[in-house]
Amino acid sequence: MRVRNRKGATELLEANPQYVVLNPLEAKAKWRDLFGNDNPIHVEVGSGKGAFVSGMAKQNPDINYIGIDIQKSVLSYALDKVLEAGVSNIKLLWVDGSDLTDYFEDGEIDRLYLNFSDPWPKKRHEKRRLTYKTFLDTFKRILPENGEIHFKTDNRGLFEYSLVSFSQYGMKLNGVWLDLHASDFEGNVMTEYEQKFSNKGQVIYRVEAEF
């Protein structure tokens, strides 16, 4: 989600260390200490303006959430939502999420969310897709045995590609939704993109895949 640079974004992030982890490399293997409890840790890669991660944190107070985004302006808007929600079970990371092993120990997180990731439709960009096998290698490391990836997209091509990628990797598909919003799935929290696409009548796809 590309947005214009927000004036004061850096200062806003730095002024809220209770939510924004300013030294993420030092947090590796210490996340439960940072949260102050042993609750499960769920991570969203590419959290955008934070509607999903803040909504999930409010909906599930006994789960710790971490939202990751590389764009500081976007993350500052996510921080706005966190502050508005008044939740304490959330942290934000202003980092490139291409190698999460820089920030998480093996098996340190319990679930990973990939919501509306860049589909990188051209074949030559296949390795950039977050459901490509090298990313799955990384995700498998930081998740526990039988750890799960929950994936949503509006892009049919990326959805089909990801189903194949998960299956070829040996993952178990615990749930596949071909039209999430027309299903009986309960507890869905929408991202900004999801709300936008849904308002246009676009189908939303969802997968729960287990290592």
Curated annotation (Swiss-Prot):
Keywords: Methyltransferase, S-adenosyl-L-methionine, Transferase, tRNA processing. The keyword Acetylation does not apply. GO terms for cellular component: tRNA methyltransferase complex. S-adenosyl-L-methionine binds at residues 44, 69, 96, 118. GO terms for molecular function: tRNA (guanine(46)-N7)-methyltransferase activity. Pathway: tRNA modification; N(7)-methylguanine-tRNA biosynthesis. The keyword Ribosomal protein does not apply. InterPro entries: SAM-dependent_MTases_sf (IPR029063), tRNA_(Gua-N-7)_MeTrfase_Trmb (IPR003358), tRNA_methyltr_TrmB_bact (IPR055361). Substrate binds at residues 122, 154, 191-194. Belongs to the class I-like SAM-binding methyltransferase superfamily. TrmB family. PANTHER family: 3-DEOXY-D-MANNO-OCTULOSONIC-ACID TRANSFERASE/TRNA GUANINE-N 7 - -METHYLTRANSFERASE, PENTACOTRIPEPTIDE-REPEAT REGION OF PRORP DOMAIN-CONTAINING PROTEIN. Catalyzes the formation of N(7)-methylguanine at position 46 (m7G46) in tRNA. This is tRNA (guanine-N(7)-)-methyltransferase.
